[in-house]
Amino acid sequence: MEIDLKDKIMKLKKEKNAVILAHFYQPKDVQEVADYIGDSYFLIDVGEKCKEDTIVFCGVKFMAESAKILSPNKKVIFPTPKAICPMANMITKEDVLKLKEKHPNAKVVCYINSTAEVKSVVDVCCTSSNAIEIVNNLESNEIIFLPDKNLGSYIQENTPNKKIILWDGYCYVHNKIKASDIIKAKEEYGNDINVLVHPECRKEVRELADYIGSTKGIINFAQNSNSKKYLIVTECGVIHELKKKNPDKEFYMLDMHCSNMKMNSIKEIYTCLKNYNNEVKIDENIKRKAVRALEKMHSL
């Protein structure tokens, strides 16, 4: 049944001139039918540059929205509309406006993991891989960073000349990991294990890392390192790409499972491609304002 569905998806892709984009955290079978696998920034960039008319975005809602904002003339379909990012929903447009009123001299930087409405009222977006560079390149010394307090504190550590005002948002998958989890894992797997940590983790976890970086950064580090054993401290879906690129290395994961990222399935991909349903729609006014923040990220 699964093989049959995969064949049908491949056929439909050609018929409908569609490209399938899947985030590293997606289920293995979804990654297997994708044309491109990557982090949110890479996938949104691919969607903007690809020749296909239709983008099937397998991730969570903010990613599909961002793809639509930067590719307004393409049809963006989202297999499972209920797959939202809880962190993105921890702040509203109204919250941002109140922060701006309270800190009128501050520039507002939002993590790409935020809604289209929030993106429409900030100065610039960033990703976990370019956040430090973006903040350093802003002229203002006062920066409101939202919604992720953990990534925000990591930025503050690496931009000491800036004052970072944080929002109390977090990724529930990364935020639950504590230093004791890392210590326990090292006791189990050996102190020689390389600990690779996503910056959405708490400071106490980052302090025990051998490397801190985005999902793509973690994959690149493992690929280029001579070490053979790694503890991967991010969502478990990234293991598929790590094993594919490094078959001779050992990877160990913590219990880090994003149920929202796992909502997409090849059945939903097939259904939305077949029926052209679940198209991403964004208010034109919001889209016009949000695109400025995303485009400024490219310029910085």
UniProtKB/Swiss-Prot annotation:
GO terms for molecular function: 4 iron, 4 sulfur cluster binding; metal ion binding; quinolinate synthetase A activity. Gene3D superfamilies: NadA-like. Binds 1 [4Fe-4S] cluster per subunit. One of its GO terms (cellular component) is cytosol. It catalyses: iminosuccinate + dihydroxyacetone phosphate = quinolinate + phosphate + 2 H2O + H(+). [4Fe-4S] cluster binds at C85, C171, C258. Its cofactor is [4Fe-4S] cluster. Pathway: Cofactor biosynthesis; NAD(+) biosynthesis; quinolinate from iminoaspartate: step 1/1. Keywords: 4Fe-4S, Cytoplasm, Iron, Iron-sulfur, Metal-binding, Pyridine nucleotide biosynthesis, Transferase. Iminosuccinate binds at H23, S40, Y111, I112, N113, S128, H198, P199, E200, T215. The keyword DNA-binding does not apply. It is an enzyme of class 2 (transferase). InterPro entries: NadA (IPR003473), NadA_sf (IPR036094), Quinolinate_synth_type2 (IPR023066). It holds the Pfam family NadA. One of its GO terms (biological process) is 'de novo' NAD biosynthetic process from L-aspartate. It is found in: Cytoplasm. Its EC number is 2.5.1.72. Belongs to the quinolinate synthase family. Type 2 subfamily. Catalyzes the condensation of iminoaspartate with dihydroxyacetone phosphate to form quinolinate. This is Quinolinate synthase. It comes from Clostridium novyi (strain NT).
